[in-house]
């Protein structure tokens, strides 16, 4: 049940990651606020909120910021925005499919920023449904290896509904149906295995292999999209081989 991950290809390692910390914090805070608004402010009774808080903590978001976001979302503190989730679809260079999830309080601004980022970087917007059919919504739990083998992880999560365990090199990701995400995460906890994040996302059913130049163009487009404060997540169906990734890392 191993194999090259199609999930993490938009998470290409870049030296600019520190410069993006502020944007990453803002995205994590939004997730907490929305989760608390939708499912209530008690993490014990709201698994989505629990996972959003855990991910923020793992990413070193200050506890004060986390708690204020939870309170805003739950209505315990004023100042919460009316966040709306909007999905956009498009194509990157080489026919790579792109799904863009925005979490915004201004639909017009989000649409404009996504369109500009796409067209300036060789991409094109697509009609609703023309790209999304290539993706399935899945639950994904990521965890550092820390001496664990794939069999160790599989033994912990198989009965909980896990579909696949992917070896990402330094870490594993466990794929499941979204409805089994909490069970998989809980199974890891019960086995004493620490995890980095647990969240729902999209996984492609068909992938597009690219060479170094193609990968560079796709990552450039993803970077441009993620520069927008309204863009929460970007998924693609690009397949970047280990050899191509190694070449990119040398640049």
Swiss-Prot record:
InterPro entries: Integrase-like_N, TACO1_YebC-like_2nd/3rd_dom, TACO1_YebC_N, Transcrip_reg_TACO1-like, Transcrip_reg_TACO1-like_dom3, YebC-like. GO terms for cellular component: cytosol. The keyword GTP-binding does not apply. Keywords: Cytoplasm, DNA-binding, Transcription, Transcription regulation. Belongs to the TACO1 family. It comes from the Bacteria. Its main location: cytoplasm. GO terms for molecular function: DNA binding. One of its GO terms (biological process) is regulation of DNA-templated transcription. NCBIfam families: PRK00110.1, PRK12378.1, YebC/PmpR family DNA-binding transcriptional regulator. It is found in: Cytoplasm. This is Probable transcriptional regulatory protein MMAR_2098.
């Amino acid at each position: 049940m191993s194999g090259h991950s199609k999930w993490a290809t938009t998470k290409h390692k870049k030296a600019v990651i520190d410069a993006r910390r502020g944007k990453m914090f803002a995205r994590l805070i939004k997730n907490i606020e929305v989760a608390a608004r939708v499912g209530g402010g008690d993490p014990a009774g709201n698994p989505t909120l629990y996972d959003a808080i855990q991910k923020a903590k793992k990413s070193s978001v200050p506890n004060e910021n986390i708690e204020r976001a939870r309170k805003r979302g739950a209505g315990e503190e004023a100042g919460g925005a009316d966040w709306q989730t909007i999905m956009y679809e498009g194509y990157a260079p080489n026919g790579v499919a792109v799904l863009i999830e925005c979490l915004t309080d201004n639909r017009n601004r989000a649409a404009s920023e996504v369109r500009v980022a796409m067209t300036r970087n060789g991409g094109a917007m697509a009609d609703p449904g023309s790209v999304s059919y290539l993706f399935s919504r899945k639950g994904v739990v990521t965890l550092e290896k820390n001496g664990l083998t794939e069999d160790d992880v599989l033994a912990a999560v198989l009965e909980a509904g896990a579909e696949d365990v992917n070896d990402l090199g330094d870490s594993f990701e466990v794929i499941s149906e979204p409805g089994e995400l909490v069970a998989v995460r809980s199974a890891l906890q019960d086995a004493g295995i620490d995890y980095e994040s647990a969240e729902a996302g999209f996984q492609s059913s068909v992938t597009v292999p690219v060479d170094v130049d193609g990968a560079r163009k796709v990552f450039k487009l993803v970077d441009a999209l993620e520069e927008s404060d309204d863009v929460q997540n970007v998924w693609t169906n690009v397949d970047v081989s280990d050899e191509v990734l190694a070449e990119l890392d040398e640049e």
